[in-house]
Amino acid sequence: MNAPASNPRVLILCTGNSCRSHMAEGILRAAAGDILEVHSAGSQPSGFVHPKAIAVLAEIGIDISSHTSKSMNDFLDRDINTVITVCGNADQACPIFPGQIHRHHWPFDDPAHATGTEEEILVEFRRVRDEIQAAFLAYAAEAKKITSTSPSA
């Protein structure tokens, strides 16, 4: 679902744009895509979306299989209202975006660095997904509350 251009734009940044930022984008778009235009990008994009990130979001009914890894430079000429960084490296490499009103840094462990058996790695992806989901569902609920109480709503 694509939001109208008049909705506030949220850009979720991570270093590689392969795991955390895509999970956050999928979750936030599913929860608030009707009131927010949600994108993700990376300061050093990996060029792919991690298959386990796709798999653990599918487990909760969110399809990010069509997502692609993008550079934050692709958004420098966009009117971004909020930038949310989800890993430490992106916070230092994040430029000031035009029109940016809000900036948040919510660090999450990188599940791509998980080691162990296939199941242990999936457990780590699920743990990080659940942390991201809790944070971004709360953000979506707050955005909906603000939207419903604004004079133009």
Where are these regions (language model features)?
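Redox-cofactor binding/interface segments in oxidoreductases and associated redox assembly factors
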Residues: 85-86
